[in-house]
């Protein structure tokens, strides 16, 4: 009975903070907003340095960076109905991470989230650090890392891209659930119980969304290779070398 009551309480919170699972303005306590900004900013700075050093002087990479940003904006702006009147969305972060590495996407993802907060009331300024860390940092590194691991163990390119993109989506929601659990621990069970509740609720919609995003990313990457085959093929094969 206590578990049912706890889940019901979490469900009652969802419409208040979840706008496509970007944590909304004013929802996180101020100390947590500062913490997540302080964690995100070093990745933002590293991404800016990386872009200036490795991408800014290459027109083909700049075009792909712009495309990756548009892809993230389009997918993460979608708001699909979820449980208790809330909504969920794909992130789109995996495509850019696979093509260009995670550091550029730490910048692009943050810019996308800023525009969404200002133009779409989607997320917020005080919660931008938390949202950017979960999607643009954790999601990007998860997508890139699993893509590389899958390729090294012998999986096909399409399977590797699928796993990378899907994991980027799922990691975003795992970290968001952790952020909410840390800020709002359960009275019984603390952070662990709260995390289990939040992540369990959003798994209902995020698992199928992650699968769909993985499939879409494979399709988009294949189309990019057809129309920009030399550039995209080189990036897909050599992303890990670029990161070094």
Curated annotation (Swiss-Prot):
GO terms for cellular component: ATP-binding cassette (ABC) transporter complex
GO molecular function, one term: cobalt ion transmembrane transporter activity
Functional pathway: Cofactor biosynthesis; adenosylcobalamin biosynthesis
Highest taxon of the lineage: Bacteria
Span of the signal peptide: 1-20
UniProt cross-references to NCBIfam families, sorted A to Z: cbiM, PRK08319.1
Assembly, per entry: Forms an energy-coupling factor (ECF) transporter complex composed of an ATP-binding protein (A component, CbiO), a transmembrane protein (T component, CbiQ) and 2 possible substrate-capture proteins (S components, CbiM and CbiN) of unknown stoichimetry.
Protein name: Cobalt transport protein CbiM
Species per Swiss-Prot/TrEMBL record: Thermosediminibacter oceani (strain ATCC BAA-1034 / DSM 16646 / JW/IW-1228P)
Lineage, highest ranks first: Bacteria, Bacillati, Bacillota, Clostridia, Thermosediminibacterales
């Amino acid at each position: 009975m206590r578990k049912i009551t706890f889940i019901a309480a979490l469900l009652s919170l969802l419409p208040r903070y979840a706008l496509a699972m970007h944590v909304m303005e004013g929802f996180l306590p101020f100390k947590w907003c500062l913490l997540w900004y302080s964690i995100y900013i070093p990745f933002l700075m590293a991404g800016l340095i990386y872009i200036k050093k490795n991408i800014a002087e290459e027109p083909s990479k700049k075009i792909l960076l712009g495309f990756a940003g548009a892809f993230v904006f389009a997918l993460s702006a979608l708001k699909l109905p979820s449980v208790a009147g809330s909504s969920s969305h794909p992130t789109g972060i995996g495509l850019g991470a696979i093509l260009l590495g995670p550091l550029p996407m730490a910048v692009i993802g943050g810019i996308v989230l800023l525009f969404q907060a200002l133009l779409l009331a989607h997320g917020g300024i005080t919660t931008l650090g938390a949202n950017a860390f979960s999607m643009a940092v954790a999601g990007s590194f998860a997508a890139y890392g699993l893509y590389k691991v899958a390729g090294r163990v012998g999986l096909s390119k399409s399977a590797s891209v699928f796993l990378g993109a899907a994991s980027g989506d799922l990691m975003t929601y795992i970290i968001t659930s952790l952020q909410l659990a840390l800020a709002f621990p359960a009275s019984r069970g603390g952070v662990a119980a709260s995390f289990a509740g939040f992540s369990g609720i959003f798994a209902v919609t995020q698992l199928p969304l992650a699968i769909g995003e993985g499939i879409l990313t494979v399709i988009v990457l294949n189309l990019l290779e057809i129309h920009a085959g030399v550039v995209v093929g080189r990036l897909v094969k050599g992303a890990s070398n670029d990161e070094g």
